[in-house]
Structure formats: structure tokens, C-alpha cells
């Protein structure tokens, strides 16, 4: 009996030892060995950043996210990575912005949560410029990039990259060969002031429709026209519901790579540099691939039987003359005239040129 009790006491002593400091030290030592010589277990613990965007897994936004993830894992030696949530899988666009603001999400690819980006997208019309000039101005060290970074900081966001700009083109089920044809359109609008003002001037009717419901609205003839980039027309399948495409160059669309400022501040200097390097790599990678992506989108659209039109210079000028003042007024009211002029100047519009475009 005494031998049995002795065995029980010995077993209890061994179990108690598992929670002792010596046992804990042994566990840490084991983790250090698994991590490898010359590094601590803490250093080998992978830090994962959460990234969200609203596009599909076949989109440029998702390709940018994947490029950033791959680069970050490589340059950090596997100590950092990115978890990607496409298709607003963490909630709607507003949910995503709320999550981004409260620190639930670390990175976001999409439009910035600032009213100034709307004005920047309309700069081809407002400043009589083109997307390549704007892209350069939004590059590292560019005047627009500096403004963009300043505006985003007010929302606790850091601009890490600006993805390629694309013109929004007109897609319709009524041929639009000239400005007057637009009067026959029931145009889908996206519900913001600039978009509504522009199309209400040009079209017979307008109707706000969420992009996720646009294909159905076209099928049911609630609307017979919409505008978007070539790649987005393909991504959302909208091109299958239209018969005509008319090229326009009054507005661009572009995504930005943004990071929550507090999350960035929580990283070490090395980690911050790795994240910035990964974002710059993603920006370069997508920019290099963009011409091919747009060409492939147009080929897919025309292969569907969609007919493409280009407006005459007279019609393009007429559209700009008819709409420019309304868009200027919209953003002057929203941002303030001084703020709008600052954006125009950053886009390379000199004061004299600005006055000229205002007169139309």
C-alpha cells in the first residue's frame, strides 16, 4: 500500500513540474530552437495585416493585393504577411470604411474616404487635362499625390500607392454617335452630386442604381445606359447587357492603396519600410500590366458584339461646355472654392487656363 501511495505522490510531483518556471523555460528554449539560431521565437511569429477591397478576385485591385502580399512575405523573411478579403467580404463599402477607421482592417484598396477624390476624378473635365498627366501628378513626389496624402491623413489614412487611372466610358443599349443621342438615354447614376449633375444635363432621365444590381436593371430596362471603366464593365459582367460603347474622356476612376495610420505607427521602422516597399512594388506591377488588361477587356467586349463609337471633337467640346460649370459648382460647394482651386493648380492648371475652362 505504501508503495502505491509513493507512486501516486511521484506522479503528482511530475505533473506539478510541468507548470514550473523550469518547464516554461524549456518550452521557450524549444520554440527558440524551432525558430532557428540567431533569432527569437517572437521574431519568427508572423504578423498578419488584414486587407479589404470591393472588387472580385480577378480584378486589378486583387492582383495588387496579391503582389503586395507576396512582396511583403519575401522582404520580411516570412515574418509579415497580408490576409486578403475581396468582394467586400467583410461587409459593405461603408462597413469596410468603418472597419478601416476603427482598426479592424489594416489596409484598404479602393477609393479614399475623402470628398477631394471625387474632384480629382473629374479633373480631365475641370482642368482640361488627360489621365496620363494626372497619373504622373499622383506619382511619388507629385503635387496631387502630396495633396492626396494630406487629405487622407485627416481620415487617419496613409496613401501607400495610386493604381492606374482609367477613363469611364459610356455603355448603352441605344447607339450614341453624337451628343444629341444622349437625350434618349435613361442613365444609371451612382448617387453622388457630380455624377448626377453631369448626366442630368446630358440625358433624358437618370436613375440611381447600385453596381451590384446594375445588370438586372439593364435587363429589366429600368435604365438603358451606364458608365464605367472597360475593366469594370467586364468584371461586373455589365458588358453582356449592353450593345454599344461610346468612348468618353471627362472622368477617370482609380483605386488607392491605403493603410490605417495607427496600425502603421504600431510597427517597427523596418516593418514600416517593408510595407511601403511592398505597396510600391504592387503599384509598379499593376501599372505595367494595365495596358494589356484594358486591351483584353475591350477585345472581350467587342467579341460580345458590342459596337464602339468615338465622338467628334465638336461633340466632345459641346459636352464639356455644357457640363463643366455644373461640376465646378458642385465641388466648390462641397470642398470650398479655395480648396478646389488648390486641386486644379496641383493638376497643372494655371490660373489663366482655369479661367479659360470656366468660360467654356
Where do the model's predicted regions map?
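N-terminal secretory/targeting leader peptides
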Residues: 19-130, 158-360
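A gly/proline- and charged-residue-enriched helix-loop-helix capping module
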Residues: 131-149
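Soluble sensory domains of the PAS superfamily and closely related sensory modules
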Residues: 152-153
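C-terminal motif of bacterial Sec signal peptides marking the signal peptidase cleavage site
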Residues: 14-17
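Positively charged n-region of N-terminal signal peptides that target proteins for export
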Residues: 1-8
